[in-house]
Amino acid sequence: EGAGRQDSFGLNIALPFESTANSFIAGDAKLINFNYFFTRKLSFVKEADAAVGLPGGFGTMDEVFEALTLIQTGKASIYPIVLLDAEGGTYWKFWKQFIDEHLARLGLISQNDFSLFKVTDDVEEAVSEVVNFYRIFHSYRYVGDQIIIRLNEALSEEAVASLNEEFSEVVKSGTIVQQSCLEEEDDESEIDRLSRIVFRHRRRDFGRLRQLIDAVNVSETAVAK
C-alpha cells in the first residue's frame, strides 16, 4: 500500500504472466509501465529516498543487490535499505547469514558494508530506520573531491570534533568542518539555509560513510546545546 494512491507513483514491469499492477496503484495516471527491468531499476533507485525489500524471488534479489551495489560503489547516494520480513520470518535472516558466511568471509565485501542495510521483522523498527536517517542528515553531494553533507540542524562544536576523531580515515586530507553552503550549490537555492559539514572524501568504503551519517543523526546539535 505504501503512501496510498494519492501520494504514490508506481513502477510496473510488463510480464507475460502478471498483467496488472497491485490494486493500490492500478489504473492510476502515476503508474509507469516498463518493458525492461534495467530501466525500472534505474527509475526507482534515482527517485527513492529509502527502499524496503519484502521476501520475493529472483526479481527481488536483483533489485536489492542493484541498490546495494550502486550505493556500495558510490554510483548512487546512500539511503536507507530495509529488508523487512513477516513477524518471525527467516527469509532475510538467512539471506544475511549467506552474505556473512560467504561474501564477507571470503573478503568480497567488508564488514562496514553491513551498515548499508537493515534486516528486521518489526514494522515499527523499519519505520524508525527510515525516519531516523533523516533526523539531522538531509542530503549530500560532491563538489570536486569535497563531500558536502547538508544538515537539518547545525551540530555543536563538540559534535564536529567527535566526528573528526572517530572518522578520520574517511577524510582524504584536512578535517571535517561545519560551514554554510558553497557557491557551487547555487543550483539548489531552496536548501541554501541548511548547515553543512564538508570534507575531502576518499570516495571508498561507503559503508563507513553510512556510519558517519548515523553518527551525525545522534549528535548533539548547536540548538540543543
Segments (PLM) and residue ranges:
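Conserved thiamine diphosphate
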Residues: 42-53, 102-121
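Metallocofactor- and cofactor-centric catalytic cores in central/energy metabolism, strongly enriched
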Residues: 1, 148-160, 173-225
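Short acidic-hydrophobic, aromatic-tinged amphipathic segments that line or gate anion-handling sites
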Residues: 30-39, 115-126
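Short, solvent-exposed amphipathic alpha-helical segments in soluble enzyme
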Residues: 2-3, 66-71, 98-101, 134-135, ...
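Active-site/ligand-binding-proximal alpha/beta "capping" segment
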Residues: 33-82
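Glycine-rich phosphate/pyrophosphate-binding loop at beta-loop-alpha junctions
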Residues: 2-5, 12-20, 24-27, 69-73, ...
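Acidic/glycine-enriched connector segments
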Residues: 1-53
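PLP-dependent amino-acid enzyme catalytic core
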Residues: 119-143, 155-165, 172
